[in-house]
Amino acid sequence: MELKSIKDAFDRVATKQKLSYSKTNEIVHMLSQEIDKALSILEETPSSDTMLLDHRSILADVKKVFMEIAPITQLEATEKELHAALTKYPKVLEKQLNPDISKAYRHNVEFDTHIVNQIIANFFYRQGMFDIGDCFVAETGESECSTRQSFVEMYRILEAMKRRDLEPALNWAVSNSDKLKEARSDLEMKLHSLHFLEIARGKNSKEAIDYARKHIATFADSCLPEIQKLMCSLLWNRKLDKSPYSEFLSPALWNNAVKELTRQYCNLLGESSESPLSITVTAGTQALPVLLKYMNVVMANKKLDWQTMEQLPVDAQLSEEFQFHSVFVCPVSKEQSSDDNPPMMMSCGHVLCKQTINKMSKNGSKSSFKCPYCPTDVDISRCRQLHF
């Protein structure tokens, strides 16, 4: 769903409401001032029958000022603008928040219930919701998730890091040092750097230097600039916040280390850094508005049933983080490749989809045909399927 348009409509209503509130307060304040001014004059005027006409003139002046201010007219104008914005807002909600999303369902898709349950249980464990995960596994009758204990250990390390205790994280990183190097991760260096800064923060420069010699010097080949900054920061140890190295006080260093540890921990488990369930639901949420619009507008008029279609009836653009595989679109037919219509590399090196090659060779009745992008005569027997 397009939440931006909903937010924009809400912001317009909120702005009109604030303006209405501000204008109302302004008018009430002006009226109150005029009333207080008139009361002060009346209190100063002697109360006698001879001054009755003066009292009436004062009240007449107040009435004249009220007429000039025209509070009702001003309030009606702001209220009218607010009412117009409030009237439009529900229409935006009705347009964006489709109450019936069942039109986008594929009812004939078969799911392996066991796999779906395992994905859901794995999601709970990845989020650290171990009690909920255990309850879900028990109620569904599934066997315990094989990664549960590993995630328990991961969260034990993360909880220690929240307390600025780096020992569990360092122990894990050191024991998996070779694997982290293969993954080209600088996690171990980051953790040692944080420990170095914690020692230095305790005003113990000598201990920090000894720690750097023992644990950080080994990373000099790959992380020399970072090591130089760490060592120079010791010169500003007592006023690091006012130094060129104040970045070392940023909580972002710890947050980045936590994210990197989580990413690498999941990587060594053979898991993606993000939960498959989260990715699936988020990607589906992005594609849903496009599908609903297509179903409501196009499919309803054509009386087609997309339940029998092998591919999505419309292109659903997803954010870059959901693009995991290369996609080939045939330059001739403009169709996206599929299992039934894979990309084929011709002898000249150009690539077309299989169905396009079949059409150009008239379903194989011709042993060769001219490439549409170069003067080469393509031999059908030499066309090879590409795998991205």
Swiss-Prot record:
Zinc finger (RING-Gid-type): 330-374
Superkingdom of origin organism: Eukaryota
Residue ranges of domain CTLH in the record: 150-207
Keywords assigned by UniProt, alphabetized: Cytoplasm, Metal-binding, Zinc, Zinc-finger
Glycosyltransferase found in the keyword field: no
Domain spans labelled LisH: 112-144
GO molecular function, a single term: zinc ion binding
An example Gene Ontology CC term for this record: cytoplasm
Gene Ontology biological-process entries: proteasome-mediated ubiquitin-dependent protein catabolic process
Locations listed in the record: Cytoplasm
Keyword presence, Cytoplasm: yes
Gene3D superfamilies for this protein: Zinc/RING finger domain, C3HC4 (zinc finger) (3.30.40.10)
SMART domains: CRA, CTLH
Pfam families tied to this protein: CTLH, zf-RING_UBOX
Subunit structure: Interacts with RANBPM.
Name of the molecule in the record: Protein RMD5 homolog
Gene name of the record: RMD5
